[in-house]
Each structure stands twice: as structure tokens, then as C-alpha cells.
């Protein structure tokens, strides 16, 4: 009690101290210092005016009455004109509030008094959204029965069914969605589609007609950034929308995108160089209001924006300095950029119309001959030049002044467009190569405009028009004026052609240097122009070298000749001839037997042809696949002719046989001096016949390159001490071989008429038979070698060809065997006719030996023919298919073996892993056992100690019991 009284005294003392502190503050206040009269007057004035009254707005009174459920007060307010759909600061109506409060009676009262059931608040929520979120099923059914929409989307793109959590509510809403046929995806994208349509309309019209939201001041850019409409955002930025536009709170689109966590919108705005440090009215930057997971991304975007801004500033400085230097140096200084005012008579107005109609096509052409070009240059020199100022505005105004009335128009539509495009562009460098600006003007010609352009071009030719241009081609009269440049180009080209006529790039460089006025065209137009030039040409000789294929080849240089005049002719030809183009037909010079050098020299001496070739606009050389395959095939043929292990074809065999017979005839003629004396013109005639045949061969070999011949054969003649072995082409060697066989026949025919003895004739026949046996042995070896080579090369013929197909003599084996038989029978008959001379007196033994040799030869011939038939009857296709099937079987076996090997490896790895796991498990088990054993041993020792203590305790306990008993006895005795 004393303590309670003490505590109560302490509280009283603290209360008195607080009151004293209040009084002290009051004494120091301004109110206490005022005079008492003034305080009393103030109180009297306040009581006279009455207490102050607080007045609320009608909307707030209406919402308060609805919240309290006072229907009578609500009716009075509605009668006085209150809005039933009035909203509070958050956009909530009385119906929203009644739905949230689950006041079904007030909901029915408001709906019956025509409250809007689809009214949205500031977040886009309708009363049905609220009912679905709260799970009020009866209110939701009532809303749906009175026309509430289940497809309205709130600000976050959610429909009422998305907010429903209870299964019954979700089923009800989804059933109504199906019943009303509402497309929820379309409803979610409706706002974005509408904004996308408006943004495209603003972009196309060039005028942005956006209306800010009255409540928040938000723009379309704010909405697109906050909701992540990326496409709308890009279109609005492209239309020129202000990136840093602010709403009523000072928020920019970047604030909205950062606050709602839209990363893509932040990236788009930052890359468009928006202000990332701008502050709203509360002093917050986008970093301050951003979502926590987006701050690092914004910092990275700010660094990237700094880099982009510095690059843009550097680019702008370069552009400004470039423009300033160009304006200071003056525009269009050189003669190539000067404007010429064309003066054309009224009689040529129709020609100008034709030029206008054809100027829109994609062809760029030049004049037909140098006469028209020189006339154009003279007219351009005589025409007055328009004065050009450095200012673009003055230039354009002067051009407009110089353009006369439409009736006396001196410019075509294409030239006017050309002039306007010249002023809008920056000045091009002076020393630009022709190839660079020509490549910039390359266009693809329209195929259906070809005939129309060709007709207009012929009409312009007939009327004497000078140059035929396209709307995009620059004026090149100044280039034609520059005679020095033209001479340098011509001299350079004349030096360049003999050395560099091989590659496609050299051809392109030649065309660029030679014809600077030519413009690049498509292939179809080029062919059409060549046909037109061929039709209108007056010299038909120049059409022969030109073809319509674009396969350019290297031309081999001429061989050195003894005549100096021929060397000069070859040099002049190589510097003036155009490129050689392959055709499938032989050249006229080679077909007629005339050397190619003569034709080239005649073509090179024509000056009109040279001018035509220099002015002609060729198609830009393109790598031709056919030319590539042709080159590969020919190089393969050349490699085959160089190999020492190549096969001997039937043609080689026939040529060797005829050459061998010719050499044998020469030896026979040498052994018969009397026959030589009687007929000294035999061999001379044959050699005379051989020399003319060898001459055109040499000429053809020099005039024609190795690549122009379809098939190459290199013959190997028997080595002779007095006659070197030379390669002869088949077309050139056949006449000489025919003359050789003719010489043999004439020598044989002159044999019976000679005055030699029978013994010499018999010896000659015997030698001839011996040599024929050797030749037949060689023939057998060659034929067997040829057949084995054909077997080896058969697989190559079965391959798919990638280039031009070459015909070989190996394709028909039946014909080969028949030709071999005929050749062998012919030789046997010749030998028999030569050996059995009726005038000779040979012995019976000689005839028997000859018969034996003949039978041996027939046996060899039969074996050879049987071998040929076996080779011809062999089906290589079946062999190839069998090899393929065997190869496939081996592949499958290999795959199976590989699979088995992989399985075995996997099993081995698994077993090794299991073994390792077992060993590791065993070691771990051993460790555990060791630990348990140690623990048990420790426990045993502890238990032993406890047992010792227990025994001691038992002994102590017993001792204490004994003492206790003794004490009890003592006490009992004392008590007695």
C-alpha cells in the first residue's frame, strides 16, 4: 500500500509540472499579450455574426447520400438536378461504390434511375469489373441482365473474366462472352489498332491532330509508351511528335514507360534521343519513378544515348564543313557541269516530243557515228552558256526565268528534271573515274519497252538526232569536247590491248576508258542495239566478227616470222582488232582456207570499223557459266594430251598405220635405185603434194588459238633420224596421209614395169612381209593398249557432263571392231598380193613358211576380234550398279560396326563408372563404419566410466543408509 501511495504521488507531481509548463508557454504567447478589451470585442463580433458554415458540392452530397443508403435523400437530389453518373477524384460513380459495398438494393435503385452500367473509372474499370473482382455473383448477373458489356477492357488490358477468381464467376462471364459473340483478343487490341490507324493517318498527312486528355493532359505518345504500343510509338516519332512532351504533372513519355516497366518503349525513346534527365513537377527524373528492375537498363540506355548523340554531332559537323567548303569553292566550276541553253527550231518540236516520250525508259544510248558526235560538240560550243551563281536560290530562279513558254520549249521534260536534280545534289568530285559514275547509272531495261524504244531510236536516226539519253544520264557534251583526254585514252588503249586482252576485268577497264560516253544497259537491250547496227551498217565485212555471245577468250599471240612485214602486220592487227568471240561455226577465213592473219589485217585497216568499236556500248562483262565449263573441258583435254599414260585412240592408230606404210614405201624406193632413176618424179610428186598440205596446217596452227579447236589429238610418229616428230591436227594431217598411201600404191603399181630382177623383187617382198609382221605386232599391242585404256576411260564417259559435250571415237565399239577387222584384212591382202608375184621364182619352203605365218596372223586376228567382242559385249552399267550395291552393303556394314563400337564404348564407360562408384561407395562405407566404430568405442569407454561411478554411488548410498539407520536408532533411544 505504501508503494501505491508513493506511485500516486509521483504522477500528481508530474501532472502539476506539465501544467506549470503549459502556463509558462501561455504567458509567453502572443494571445496572452493582447489587451483584454480587444479580446472581448473579438468574441462579441464572432457571436454577432454566428458560427461559420461549411458547404459541400452537390456531387459530393449525392455520393455521400448513395453511400449511406438514404434513397429519399437521393431522390430529392435527383429531383434538384444532380447527375446520377457523377464521379469522385478516382472516377468512381455511385454505382461503382454501391457494387463495392455489396448494396444490391442501391444498385437496383441506381440502375432503375438510368445509371450507366458501362461507366469506366480512371483505371478503365466498369461496375462489372468491380463485381467480378469482388466475387459478387448476384450483382454480376443483375448487371449482365441489364446490358453490361463483358468485353470492355481496363487500362491494363483486362476484361471482367480476367479479374474473376471464383470458378462460378469465371464460368458465368465466359458463357456470356460466347453468347454475345465477343472476340476478347480483338477487344484487347482495339485501342492499339485505333491508335495505329490514327498514327498512320498523321504520318501520311504530315499534320498531327492529337487532343490531350482533359483530366491528366496525357498525349498519344504517353499512352503508347505506358502501354507498350511499340509500332504506334515508332510511327509517332517518325511523324515528328515531340519526344519530351509533358502532361499536367510534368511526366514525359519516358516517365510513363519507366514507371510501368515497358523496356522496349524506353529503348525506342532513348534511341530517338529523348531527354532522360528531364524532371516532373515534383523534381523526379525517369530514374526516380522507374520500376526497380528497369533502372540498370535505363543507365545502359543513357550511356548508349551519349554515344549516339556524339556520333550525330560529329556527322553534322562534317556535313556542315563539307557544305561550307563546297559553297566557298563554288558550284559547278568545271565545264562538265555547265548548263547549256538549247536552241531548237519550232520545226523540231515533234522530235522533242519523241525524246520526252522515250526519256522515261531505262536505256542510255549514244550517237551512231563520230560525225553526229562532232556536230553535237560544235553546236554545244556555239550555244550560250547559262551563268551559274553559288546560291541555290539564285540558280533556281535563273533557270525558271530562262525556261520559255510551253509552245517554244527548248528543254525536254527529262532535261528539266535533270537540272533540278543537279541542284539538289552535292557537287561530284572532278577526277572521278568513268567506271564509278557509270556504275551509279546502271539500270535494268524494261523488256516490254524494247520494241517501242527501238522504233523511237530508228525514228531519231532518220531525222538526224545526235544523242539519245535517259532521264537519269548526265550531260556528256563536255566530255566529248575534251579532245586531249580522248587522245590519251585512245593511245593508252592501243598500247593496252595487245598485252591485256585476257581477263574480264581488263575488258571492263577497256570499255570504261575507251567509251566514256557509253552508259550501262541490260543484256536484252544490248543485243537489240547490235541487231539495229547490223541492219543499218553499210560495211557487211565488219558484221562477221561480231556475235551475240558474251564469252570472251584470250587470243594467242602470233608466232615469230622471218618476214618483218608480217611482224608489222601482226602488231597492227593486235592493236586494232576487237575481242575474239567464240562461235559454234568456224570463222569465214578458216572455212575458206585463208590464213587468219589476212582477215584480221583487212578488218583492222578499216577506220570506220575501229570507230564503231570504240563507240559501241557493250554489256558489262559477266562471268559466263558456259565459258567456264568450256574452259575447264579444254584444259582437261590439254592435260590429257600432255600425259604420258594417255590412251591411243582409233584415229591415232590409223594415222600411225598410214605413216608407217608411207615410211616403208620410202625405204622400198631407196632400195630400188633403178626404179628411182626411171621414175624420179614419184617421191618428188609426193613431197610436193605433202608440202602444200603442211603449209595450210602451219598457217592454221598459227592463226587459230589452241582453245578454238574442239578436240585435240597429239600424234606420236615413229622416231626417224632424218625427220623430226611434229604434232599434226587431224584435219590437217589427213590429206598428207592420203597422199602417202597413194604414193605407196603408185610405187607398187610401178613395180611390175621395172627392170629389176626377180630376186630383188622377192627380197623386197620378204622384207615387206617381215616389216608387216612387226607392224602387226605393234598393231596388236596398240589395239590391246587402246582397249585397256578404253576400259579405264569408260567411267569418265559415264559421268555427268558439266560443260560442252565432246564426241569421241570411243562411243561406238562395234564400228571400232569392224574398222580394225577391215584394216587388218586389207593389210593381209596387200601383203599376199605383194608376196605372191607370178613372175617370181620362190621356193616351196618359202610358200609354206608364208602360209604358216598367215595362219598365225589369222589366229591372232581371231583372238583379237574375240577380245574386242567381249569388250563390246561387256555391260558397264550393270558392273557400275553392282559396284554401287556392293559399296552400299559395305557402307551399311561399316555403319553397323560403328554402332556396335559405340554401344560397346558406352557399356565400357558405364561399367567403369559403376566400378568407380562402387569403389567410392565402398570407401565411403568404410569411412562410415570407422566413424561408427570410433563412436561406439567412445560410448563404451564412457559407459565404463559411468559404471565405475555407479558402483561408487551404490557404495556411498549403502553407507548413507547404514548411517541413517544408526541415526534413527539413536534418536529413538534419546526420545525414550
Curated annotation (Swiss-Prot):
SUPFAM superfamilies: Ankyrin repeat
ANK repeats mapped onto the chain: 57-86, 90-119, 123-152, 216-245, 249-278
Region feature (Disordered): 1-52, 342-489, 503-873
Major localization listed first in the record, in broad terms: cytoplasm
Modified residues annotated as Phosphothreonine in this record: 444, 645, 802
Modified residue annotations for Phosphoserine: 29, 502, 833, 941
Biased composition (Acidic residues): 362-374
UniProtKB keywords: ANK repeat, Cytoplasm, Cytoskeleton, Phosphoprotein, Repeat
A Pfam family this chain is assigned to: Ank_2
Regions of compositional bias (Polar residues) in chain numbering: 538-564, 722-739, 747-763
Low complexity bias spans: 411-423, 465-477
Keyword Cell inner membrane carried by entry: no
Family matches, as CDD domains: IPD_MYPT1 (cd21944)
Basic and acidic residues bias locations: 1-24, 375-385, 480-489, 622-631, 655-679, 765-777, 818-830, 844-860
Gene Ontology biological process: signal transduction
Basic residues bias (residue ranges): 632-642, 791-801
SMART domains recorded: ANK (SM00248)
Coiled-coil features, chain-numbered ranges: none
Main function: Regulates myosin phosphatase activity. Augments Ca(2+) sensitivity of the contractile apparatus.
Subunit-level organization: PP1 comprises a catalytic subunit, PPP1CA, PPP1CB or PPP1CC, and one or several targeting or regulatory subunits. PPP1R12B mediates binding to myosin. Isoform 3 and isoform 4 bind PPP1R12A, but not isoform 1 of PPP1R12B itself. Binds IL16.
PANTHER family: PROTEIN PHOSPHATASE 1 REGULATORY SUBUNIT 12, PROTEIN PHOSPHATASE 1 REGULATORY SUBUNIT 12B
Protein name: Protein phosphatase 1 regulatory subunit 12B
Species of origin: Mus musculus
